A protein has these predicted regions:
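Catalytic cores of nucleic-acid endonucleases
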Residues: 62-114
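Eukaryote-skewed repeat-based solenoidal scaffolds used as protein-protein interaction platforms
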Residues: 14, 22-27, 104-106, 113, ...
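Active-site beta-strand-loop-beta-strand hairpin of nuclease catalytic cores
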Residues: 44-58
């Protein structure tokens, strides 16, 4: 009988808490965390890590060690675009963070090639790294 070992997701949760704190302390944004942003197309509830100013979805993807989480990034684009289309949000940003050695796909996800392909399908969703997030969303 196969069993699946539980994965330590505490680093992702810690990262969410850190980003929420940074936004609250170093920006004028209205910040809400773990918001139910509507129903997914399969009927399940869709929770988003952070919602800024009531209309911008932020999905945080922190990867500490190599794993399958990064393979779910294209699916995250789809879910976020559906939330925008179905529930009236303006835009969404996926933020990838964590040590470069933990990501096999990070450079590709941040490449113009990938971004171009995804924007043609999911026009209101983008992907950036942590440094770009800090530069765009926090006081300088």
């Amino acid at each position: 009988m196969a069993t699946s070992a539980s994965r330590d997701t505490s680093t992702g949760t810690n990262y969410e808490t850190e980003v929420e704190s940074l936004l609250e302390q170093f920006s004028d944004h209205d910040v809400q965390s773990q918001v139910m942003v509507g129903s997914k197309r399969n009927g399940g509830r869709h929770y988003c890590d952070i919602v800024i100013n009531g209309d911008e979805l932020i999905s945080l993807k922190y990867q500490r060690v190599q794993g399958t989480a990064e393979e779910k990034i294209p699916f995250e684009f789809m879910k976020l675009q559906h939330a925008i289309d179905d529930h009236g949000y303006k835009s969404a940003t996926i933020v990838v963070a964590g040590p470069d050695k933990a990501w096999k796909w990070k450079d590709y996800y941040l490449s113009e090639e990938f971004r171009g392909k995804m924007s043609s399908i999911y026009p209101n969703v983008r992907i950036i790294n942590h440094e770009q997030f800090v530069s765009e969303y926090l006081y300088q």
